[in-house]
């Protein structure tokens, strides 16, 4: 007859609380991280990164959009409403933004519509802040169907190159050194920011532990830790 599991083994087997359960259990305001995915992706792509940030004590709130044909501005309007909702939530003390790819451009446009009073730091992973050379190649074929493709070209007249950047916000950018969609140079915004490049592909950033470590460090300090060249 097998021994009954003791308290330690029962605790180990207990599932981790959900973000909403932790919100109700914790006294005091949370540091909330709003996660926004990129083009042709979904919130599940952010699950690993969100889990790693949850374990560091943040309350992650993935925000997604399904219609990839809509303009970035349509998604930005919807995301600005989410920011306003979080801003009014008494359980939320700070609203950090962590985005991947086009999600960063949606967040930039949303902040032009609504800037939360509780706005914290802004980390962008592989953002096409100056446009994407892949969008340049695809715009003739896909631009008429998928509006974001035309809005993300490197043209000086494209939407992405006409958007502003939020002022007085700590901005950190993590680029992918082997990115076939967005060059490291194109990830840089035209405002003061911290920047680091990891040797990986565009979407791999979301699954790397070192990328999550960098995100968490920037959210905590407003800086990326020094890294040994090549690592």
Identify the role of each PLM range.
Residues 1-31, 47, 54-55, 226-231:
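Alpha/beta-hydrolase fold catalytic core
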Residues 17, 22-23, 105, 111, ...:
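Hydrophobic alpha-helical segments, principally membrane-spanning helices and signal/leader peptides
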Residues 28-29, 33-44, 48, 52-66, ...:
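Serine-dependent carboxylesterase/thioesterase catalytic core
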Residues 166-231:
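C-terminal catalytic-base region of ester-bond hydrolases, centering on the histidine
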């Amino acid at each position: 007859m097998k021994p009954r599991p003791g308290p330690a083994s029962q605790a180990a087997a207990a599932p981790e609380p959900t973000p909403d359960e932790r919100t109700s259990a914790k006294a005091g305001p949370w540091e909330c991280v709003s996660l926004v995915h990129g083009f042709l992706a979904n919130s599940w792509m952010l699950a690993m990164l969100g889990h790693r940030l949850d374990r560091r004590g943040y309350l992650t709130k993935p925000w997604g959009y399904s219609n990839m044909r809509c303009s970035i501005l349509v998604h930005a309007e919807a995301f600005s409403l989410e920011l306003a909702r979080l801003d009014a939530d008494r359980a939320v003390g700070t609203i950090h933004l962590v985005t991947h790819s086009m999600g960063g451009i949606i967040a930039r446009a949303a902040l032009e519509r609504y800037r939360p009073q509780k706005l914290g730091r802004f980390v962008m992973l592989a953002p096409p802040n100056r446009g994407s050379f892949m969008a340049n190649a695809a715009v003739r074929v896909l631009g008429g169907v998928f509006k974001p493709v035309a809005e993300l070209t490197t043209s000086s007249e494209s939407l992405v190159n006409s958007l502003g950047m939020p002022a007085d916000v700590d901005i950190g950018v993590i680029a992918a050194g082997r990115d076939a969609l967005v060059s490291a140079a194109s990830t840089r915004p035209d405002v003061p920011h911290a920047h680091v490049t990891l040797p990986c592909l565009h979407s791999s950033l979301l699954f790397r532990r070192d990328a999550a470590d960098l995100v968490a460090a920037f959210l905590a300090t407003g800086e990326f830790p020094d890294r040994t060249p090549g690592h």
